């Protein structure tokens, strides 16, 4: 079996807060097909906020893959899962496929803000 590395680019984005909120993600993750990728998104007390994850392939609009920390929209494979237990939210993609190569964005929604 050939080892095919996939580059999962990562970008962080924060919305819904009137104050500045900083998110941190690694710049990229390289994973072999059929392996598992864990993509993290860190922020102060991020566990108290709703985290959403988007996948964007070149030339395409972003696709929501996880919403409200761990919920999967209809049509998203079970290989995609999310968790948000504290100061780090995680998107996990099991059994990586070539089609998973994309940019992944974490987005935080602070429901305590009306902005």
From Swiss-Prot:
Residues 71-106 are annotated as: Framework-3. Residues 107-115 are annotated as: Complementarity-determining-3. Residues 42-50 are annotated as: Complementarity-determining-1. The keyword Phosphoprotein does not apply. This is Immunoglobulin lambda variable 3-12. V region of the variable domain of immunoglobulin light chains that participates in the antigen recognition. Immunoglobulins, also known as antibodies, are membrane-bound or secreted glycoproteins produced by B lymphocytes. In the recognition phase of humoral immunity, the membrane-bound immunoglobulins serve as receptors which, upon binding of a specific antigen, trigger the clonal expansion and differentiation of B lymphocytes into immunoglobulins-secreting plasma cells. SUPFAM superfamilies: Immunoglobulin. Residues 51-67 are annotated as: Framework-2. It comes from the Eukaryota. Immunoglobulins are composed of two identical heavy chains and two identical light chains; disulfide-linked. GO terms for cellular component: extracellular region; immunoglobulin complex; plasma membrane. Transmembrane segments: none annotated. Residues 68-70 are annotated as: Complementarity-determining-2. Keywords: Adaptive immunity, Cell membrane, Disulfide bond, Immunity, Immunoglobulin, Immunoglobulin domain, Membrane, Secreted, Signal. Residues 20-41 are annotated as: Framework-1. It is found in: Secreted; Cell membrane. The keyword Zinc-finger does not apply. The lineage of its organism: Eukaryota, Metazoa, Chordata, Craniata, Vertebrata. Residues 1-20 form the signal peptide. Pfam families: V-set. It comes from Homo sapiens. GO terms for biological process: adaptive immune response; immune response. Gene3D superfamilies: Immunoglobulins. Residues 21-115 form the Ig-like domain. Disulfide bonds join 41-106.
